[in-house]
């Protein structure tokens, strides 16, 4: 069996045709993996994909400003509304990263961003309610998988299975 991480990079929906990341249709394919980094930040490319899809009305079941996004806002000191305004102006990934870096509160060093990203990538459910939700989806999607431990593992599995992959 291929590893989830290698399989996720080519989900069935994306492999069937090119994906337009400037206007992603999240009814046809998932956003980028939460592990994908931009400027050292994990989750930022995924957050951008969801924001662009919401702006285009093609977000499907994906939510902008979900609890995972809120952890990014908490670390950066940014707010979802002004960030969405930048997305709606058609900013590129690089321009959105420049916006993030210019508006960090407090300012963060590259080593702080790297440390936060490493920490965030390893986060697992931390209370009974979130653990129950996590376990329910894990059980439904791939109960036999023993390597699904973190929220990022869970998101990648859910995205992959939702868009036609076999766990």
Ranges and model annotations:
Residues 2-14:
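Intrinsically disordered, low-structural-confidence terminal and linker regions
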Residues 59-100:
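Amphipathic alpha-helical packing elements
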Residues 83, 87-142:
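Amphipathic protein-protein interaction modules
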Residues 11-59, 119-167:
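Polar/charged low-complexity regulatory segments
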Residues 70, 80-88, 114, 153-160, ...:
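Short alpha-helical interface patches
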Residues 33-36, 40, 61, 72, ...:
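Generic alpha-helical structural element
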